[in-house]
A protein has these predicted regions:
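ATP-binding N-terminal substructure of ATP-dependent carboxylate-amine bond-forming enzymes
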Residues: 2-13, 17, 23-27, 31-154, ...
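A short beta-strand motif that forms the metal-chelation/ATP-contact edge
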Residues: 138-140, 344-354
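A conserved helix-loop-beta module that forms one wall/lid of the active-site cleft
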Residues: 143-213, 217, 222, 228-249
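Short, well-ordered beta-strand elements within core beta-sheets of diverse protein domains
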Residues: 212, 262-263, 452-460
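Phosphate-binding site of ATP-dependent enzymes
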Residues: 224-291, 314, 338-347
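Acidic, glycine-rich loop-and-beta core segments that form the ion-binding/anion-interacting portion
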Residues: 289-306, 318
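Active-site "cap" helix and flanking loop/linker of ATP-utilizing ligase/carboxylase catalytic domains
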Residues: 314-335, 353-411
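Glycine-rich active-site loop/lid that clamps phosphate-bearing ligands
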Residues: 403-437
């Protein structure tokens, strides 16, 4: 009843024929989902071409910078699945010591070249749902190994907020707000890029890092006043993107050391998930993005959207135009919009050139559509799975984001017993814990304006049932229940 978007397919007109959270990645490890396989093996030693699982030979997929959401989802693709997969993992954990020390010397071209030598002729596809490094690395590697994927130049354009807006504004001016860029550090005497107030964020960033509404010069100066160690970390975070830009887009002067300012938007926020296969677009669904009152911090993602029937056609049409203009030809995507009911305007905020792992389960639970199965089929150029792989269990789903704004951490980390209770009581729920202390906590408050300590994904028969479930979990975990969380 809620699969309004799924199955809407559009042939995108290519504008050019030129080819353009937290993770738990394990270097070189491999496993057959839900089936014991040797870990840490080179793919050539596994002889997977001859390893049968039932009547199917497992397809070999390399996962780059795997995320916590990925690990749980991969267990569905075991020996008894319609199409089993053998997964390999490369990358590192960006937010965990000592794995993140690799950031100090990480070079995107050396990394891709190493993977090319190791996996050439030994995998059937490469996938990453990681926005920071993974999706770009996967694209670069796929091109070198002639595997399906989003073109690398397209990834760069999507992730470079200024380039994306420039390209889209030229063809669809009504889709983007007023925008301008400026370098940082910002010289105090430099003119501001736009009249205040405006919204500012890095040209290349994830998790809404340093994204803030600015209404005076002092607030902007404070936002961009970094300690030496912060400056060092920022340079290391954006260096891989700049390395790719220097080689693939040397014509672009504004690298990731720039900020972008946009005119303020008002209204409700939405995101749409879907995929493109050889230029053919299909949308999974439209999701509401609800913020903590008075902030720009995500509080809840809710599916199906309350605006679905009203905005379905417009979102579909604008998404189609945006993807065509970006020459987005093959792969999953997630696009975010602002809708202002007072002016009836629909504005683009982000184009994410990868699958949204946080919302992917919505479509499986509510519509019976497995976004991961489609993602893997795209990566290996296999026939797409049936639209309904399973019988939907629920009518609604949501992702609840638990935050603190008082400078403190959350003292109620879930215990093993509490996690076991959740798995037994609500087996379809997914809980991710991100509690921080010390320097990591202080950095998160400065860069994000809040501390996101947990995410809880749940589904319900209807809105009332979902509310009952999340309230039950909060009471059991000892977490404060913000009424806005379940309104």
């Amino acid at each position: 009843m809620n699969s309004v978007f799924f199955g809407l397919k559009k042939k995108l007109k290519s504008t050019s024929r030129q080819k353009d959270g937290n993770s738990h990645a394990l270097d070189g490890h491999a496993f057959l989902a839900a089936n014991d396989m040797p870990a840490g093996k080179d793919p050539s030693s596994l002889n997977v071409k001859n390893k049968k699982t039932g009547n199917k030979t497992p397809l070999r997929i390399l996962i780059l910078f795997g995320k916590d959401w990925d690990r749980e989802a991969l267990q569905r693709f075991g020996a008894d699945s319609d199409q089993p997969y053998l997964f390999f993992f490369e990358g590192f954990e960006l937010f965990s010591f000592p794995s993140n020390t690799r950031l100090l010397t990480f070079n995107i071209w050396r990394f891709v070249h190493k993977l090319e030598r190791r996996y050439a002729g030994k995998i059937d596809g490469v996938v990453s749902n990681n926005e920071q490094f993974g999706s770009l690395c996967a694209s670069l590697l796929a091109e070198r190994l002639t595997l399906p994927g989003v073109a690398a130049k397209c990834i760069l354009t999507c992730q470079h907020k200024y380039l994306a807006r420039q390209k889209i504004a030229a063809a669809i001016p009504e889709a983007v707000p007023q925008f301008a860029i400026f370098p940082y550090p910002l010289i105090p005497t430099d003119p501001l890029p736009l009249p205040m107030p405006f919204f500012v964020k890095p040209v290349k960033a994830t998790f809404s890092v340093l994204a803030r509404a600015i209404d005076n010069r002092g607030a902007l100066n404070q936002l961009l006043d970094f300690a030496p160690w912060e400056t060092f970390l920022i340079k290391r975070l954006v260096r891989p993107f700049n390395q790719a830009m220097q080689q693939l887009r040397p014509d672009v002067a504004a690298n990731a050391h720039y900020m972008i300012a946009e005119s303020m938007l008002s209204g409700v926020q939405l995101n749409v998930d879907g995929y493109v296969r050889d230029g053919q677009m299909t949308l999974f669904g439209l999701v509401d993005e609800i913020m903590y009152p008075g902030t720009h911090a995500f509080l809840r993602f809710a599916y199906p959207s309350r605006w679905q029937s009203q905005l379905q056609q417009r979102v579909e049409q604008m998404t189609e135009k945006i993807l065509a203009e970006l020459n987005y030809r093959h792969g999953c995507f997630n696009i975010e919009f602002f809708y202002d009911a007072d002016t009836d305007s629909l504005k683009l905020t982000e184009v994410n050139p990868r699958m949204s792992t946080q919302t992917a389960d919505f479509y499986r639970l509510v519509n019976g559509v497995d976004a991961y199965a489609i993602n893997f089929a795209l990566a290996t150029r296999q026939p797409l799975p049936p639209i309904a792989r399973s019988v939907p269990k629920f009518g609604v789903a949501a992702s609840f984001v638990f935050r603190k704004f008082d400078g403190m951490t959350c003292d109620h980390a879930p215990t093993p017993a509490q996690r076991a209770w959740l798995a037994q009581t609500y087996p379809d729920a997914r809980l991710m814990w991100y509690g921080k202390t010390g320097a990591g906590l202080r950095r998160e408050y400065k860069w994000l304006g809040s501390h996101r300590y947990a995410i809880l994904n749940m589904a319900g028969i209807d809105a009332a049932d979902l509310r009952h479930r999340v309230e039950h979990v909060c009471r059991y975990m000892g977490w404060p229940l913000d009424q806005a969380l379940v309104e």
